[in-house]
Amino acid sequence: MDQEHPQEPIEYQISNELDLHTFLPNELGELIPDYIGLCLQKDILRIRIIHGKGIGTIRETVHSLLRRDLRVLRFELASHEEGGWGATVAWLSQTLNKSNDKM
């Protein structure tokens, strides 16, 4: 890394879609929960996570993270029109998020 020009964090606009092609697999454990929290802050309750088709390692990691997150009501592979098995759609619980904010 250049000491004169330290690398600045990249800011992303939060939308209902997260494309993981620009992220490393070891970043997903923090990225996905943070993304869900930011979506809930913006009242985005249906999200689409693009993980690519590949051999399924990223997809399995995404599904594992979604399965463990209590703010996720359910998830499934996207419809053919939304990317098929290269993307996952999840529905989030705003109610659960608001009760967690009060803790």
Regions found by a protein language model. Give the residues of each.
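Long, charged, low-complexity intrinsically disordered regions
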Residues: 1-103
